[in-house]
Amino acid sequence: MIRVSGLLCALALSFLTAAGGTADGIPTARGTGEVVVTLASPPLAGRTGAAGRAARTNVDREQAQFAAALRNTIPGAQIRWRYRIVLNGAAVVVPRAAIPILRALPGVKSVDTGAAYRLVSTTATAAGAGGRWQTGLPNQGAGMKIGIIDDGIDQRHPYFSPVGYTMPPGFPKGQAAYTTAKVIVARSFVPAGTTWRHASKPFDPVESGHATHVAGIAAGNAGTTASGGASVSGVAPRAYIGNYKALTVPTASGVGLDGNAAEIVAAIEAAVADGMDVINLSIGEPEVEPSRDLVALALDAAAQAGVVPVVAAGNDFDEFGRGSLSSPGTSERAITVAAVTNPDATGSSSLASFSAAGPTPLSLRLKPDLSAPGVSILSSVPGSRWEFMSGTSMAAPHIAGAAALLLERHPTWSVADLRAALIGSGSSVQVDGQIAAPTRGGGGLADPARADVPLVLASPASVSFGLVRPGIATAIRVALTDGGGGAGVWDVAVEPIAAVAGASLVLAPTVTVPGVIDLSPTVTVDAAEGDLTGFVRLKRGADVRRIPFWLRVVRPGLATATAVELRTPGMYVGDTRGKPSLASRYRYPDVPPGGGVSAVLQGPEQLFRVTLTNPAANFGVVIVRRSKGARVEPRVVSAGDENRLTGYAALPINLNPYLAEFGDPVLVAGAVRPIAGSYDVVFDSPTPGGAGSYAFRFWIDDTRPPTARLTQARVRRGTPLLVRVADTGSGIDPTTVKVRLDGSESSGMLRSGTLRISTTGLRRGSHRLRLQVSDYQESRNTENVPPILPNTRVLTATVVIR
């Protein structure tokens, strides 16, 4: 994301950059970018004693050798962040042309761009409940430290009054002026080249707000008087707070501040090094290839280091349905939290309609892990104010606070122990009047008092069998340990929530704790497609503990389809008429009716095969022309399987929060940072009558913005300004063309590569022109490093009207 100033053209009239302008705080770029380099040895997380000291020596040596090689080989490169605990590597700002050289340096395991993350609260609401979530625990989290990795906390809010606190030894850390005896850390993690004037401050007086609300839920002081005279309290009101501002960049789409993976990983690294007991991330983005998901991997490492990561599940269910759960909630070891209505307000708990659902779209993990209040939650906002807000952003800090309470009472518990205690002791929540499946509510509504006496700890705490084909045998062994008073014989049964003909879960009728239990699904050769999910119930007298499980029986229709090989980028034509109809639903995400894109595609399909011999930055297609009446639209799947979409990038919707067109439909589908393998581009239509001919553009590794050239800087009054725009990769997206003259919106017409900008009404003399244009790949870019808006060109110029 960086960057340097743009290129002054020969006439000294126009100025080009490869990302949005400086007025909105979006970093500029011209030929440089920030990437995350991972080195060969594992990070230090979880390594102690003599082995830990040896590992530290080895990591330090590797990093010193890498830094020396970087200086000698790429003199202009700069190390922005160093990672030792949660990753072994560094964030490096390099010329983009030098990235292949960087990959070839000795000891380099991988070079990744990372993802951009945004906040996952929904909107402020008008009614709800304050007070304190009734955890049933007597303690208040005294001495525990909760790190909030978010958009910056207003430490002056009365909910965080330092009265009665003493700064713990070794603190404050970071920018001391933004700390108190309650908020003991204040750090800001700013991408290189960011121009937003408040980016480096731990609290942004213009854009920050979300983190202050989140922190109040987790650890606001008990007995604070809120608006309307209500007495409120955080879940762990005596806990310390660490403020890690990793979201620093304003967004064009108005979704608040965004942050990128390099900075979020740096914040996780700092929180672990600072001694936080719990970290909360109420942020999210569509899942990317799990082996390349830097933030999720860093959270896994934080858990290995003994820090509890708690993450919001996301708010996309209404639009994207099952498989909408976002990264970094996809982290295997994190506690991922769904949102329910506030039981303190309603007396019962139902899942919020927006709360994202599992399985995770690419890794197919069973998430979320738990549910907590996330609807109409009263908490602090900057300026000593209070608001009710809704979102899984509000649910996660309830669990962060509960985790702090439990760790205070059980200091020897591992992260896995705490996670298992919470998941196994949850109570059922409802959705649409029925008990929610684990893919919606995880282990259920968290019950910290029951988790305090877990009895049995399961490993894994929940089980995903993934996609199972008929007739294929599989099994997963779960280890059960005594969590305190749980030793002995327990009865075992299945609590089914969703069943499918021909599939069942086979279990022994009893199990002795400590011991193991084997979960063995039976899927007959004639089994129907569908989900088999529910809970394995362990019962001993009145005591019940549960293990959530999920699988889906699949019969891929596209497995028998014929695919045409796409060997080179370029323009292609196709026609779905006369082709077979082999698939009607694509997942994951499994878009519901009325969601963001077509949910059911019942037309005939035409397939084109993309084979990658190496990982790629991206690939994709855009339909540029359809015959009259045709409603053909694209999807991208793993070869031959409509159940394996390449995540959100496979759906024809604009996914880039830095674009004003965020959320709009667009006839583009692709994959972001795909690994080597075979993929199918599928052209389908909602109905058989929507079949027809079409033309499409195909690209691979489009990481460059369009070109834009002003043909003449001096024109007569009334004569249009002409700008030549072109893109050799995915092509110009005309919906992204934005023209401003002297700061005001202006009109332009794009035809055959020339943009005609009207000068009607302009006075004679000099004027400032600003043009922004993106290509179609930009609509796929949840990966926005390097740089932010890597596939967007901005042209600014002084023009003269004669």
Predicted regions, residues:
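Substrate-binding/access-modulating region of protease and related hydrolase catalytic domains
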Residues: 142, 243-333, 344, 360-365, ...
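Extracellular S/T/G-rich loop segment that most often corresponds to the catalytic His/Ser-adjacent loop
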Residues: 177-194, 329-404
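Inhibitory N-terminal propeptides of secreted protease zymogens
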Residues: 23-120
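C-terminal edge strands of extracellular/lumenal beta-sandwich accessory domains
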Residues: 539, 552-583, 608, 635-649, ...
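Acidic, Ser/Thr/Pro-rich low-complexity intrinsically disordered segments
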Residues: 498, 592-655
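Subtilisin-like serine protease catalytic core
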Residues: 30, 134-260, 274-277, 304-306, ...
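Hydrolase catalytic cores
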Residues: 215-219, 246-247, 277, 371-434, ...
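C-terminal subdomain of the subtilisin-like protease fold in secreted/lumenal serine endopeptidases
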Residues: 80, 370, 408-477, 481-484, ...
